[in-house]
């Protein structure tokens, strides 16, 4: 069992949160699994829909635009030629196959678990009490949010905030306070967490309830 310190809005340690050892279970080549997962996410976000028509696919008559001789113009075969407006495209993009990358559910969950464990082991994850997200601010105030990060010794560099979905109607003051900080890269909910968000964030601030829900989901699926 791993114990993580829990902080309040003033940066004071007010308790500890238990994290199951199974969260840190070895998955063999974990770095390769994380790499495959990130590649799949980035590849599948692309549309892969860029497609152009060549001269044989555009809708044009095959009739010569003018006679071969006597006009003074260069000879032309048809208006589908690339040099004409509306003609075919030469060497344009054309998807030759489905380039989406598939990754199964078990691999996806394992990658997220490894990324979360990695943040904990490198001290890049800060657990805060649920009141920080719900009751700490009575009104949006950026200075208060910035002071909170400094009091908790959170490095102001690519910070991801993770909260529980139950607080969606109660954490508006904190969300609005963080919105003006360039170091804050996102505010997400544990149930919708994406491994790419975890990988791209340098520091993570998570509520106790969100962490417990996330760990429980990842660990239970590992046992299955």
Swiss-Prot record:
UniProt GO cellular component terms: ribonucleoprotein complex; ribosome
Domain of life, per lineage: Bacteria
Keywords assigned: Ribonucleoprotein, Ribosomal protein, RNA-binding, rRNA-binding
Region (Disordered) location: 53-74
InterPro entries listed in its UniProt record: Ribosomal_uL4, Ribosomal_uL4-like, Ribosomal_uL4_dom_sf
Record-linked SUPFAM superfamilies: Ribosomal protein L4 (SSF52166)
Pfam families: Ribosomal_L4
GO annotation, biological process: translation
Gene Ontology MF term list: rRNA binding; structural constituent of ribosome
Function: One of the primary rRNA binding proteins, this protein initially binds near the 5'-end of the 23S rRNA. It is important during the early stages of 50S assembly. It makes multiple contacts with different domains of the 23S rRNA in the assembled 50S subunit and ribosome. Forms part of the polypeptide exit tunnel.
Self-association state and partner proteins as the record states: Part of the 50S ribosomal subunit.
Family: Belongs to the universal ribosomal protein uL4 family.
Protein name in UniProt: Large ribosomal subunit protein uL4
């Amino acid at each position: 069992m791993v114990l993580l310190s829990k902080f309040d809005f003033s940066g004071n340690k007010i308790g500890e949160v238990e994290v199951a050892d199974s969260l840190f279970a070895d998955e063999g080549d974990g770095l390769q699994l994380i790499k495959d997962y990130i590649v799949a996410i980035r590849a599948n976000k692309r549309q892969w829909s860029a497609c152009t028509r060549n001269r044989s696919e555009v809708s044009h008559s095959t009739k010569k635009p003018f006679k071969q001789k006597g006009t003074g113009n260069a000879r032309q075969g048809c208006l589908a030629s690339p040099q004409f407006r509306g003609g075919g495209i030469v060497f344009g993009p054309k998807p030759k196959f489905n380039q989406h990358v598939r990754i199964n559910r078990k691999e996806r969950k394992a990658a997220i678990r490894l990324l979360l464990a990695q943040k904990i082991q490198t001290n890049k994850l800060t657990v805060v009490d649920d009141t920080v997200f719900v009751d700490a601010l009575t009104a949006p105030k950026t200075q208060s949010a910035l002071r909170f990060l400094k009091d908790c010794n959170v490095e102001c560099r690519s910070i991801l905030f993770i909260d529980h979905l139950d607080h969606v109607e109660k954490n508006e003051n904190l969300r609005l306070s963080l919105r003006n900080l360039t170091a804050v890269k996102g505010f997400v909910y544990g149930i919708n967490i994406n491994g790419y968000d975890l990988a791209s964030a340098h520091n993570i601030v998570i509520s106790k309830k969100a962490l417990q829900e996330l760990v429980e989901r990842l660990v239970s699926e590992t046992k299955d």
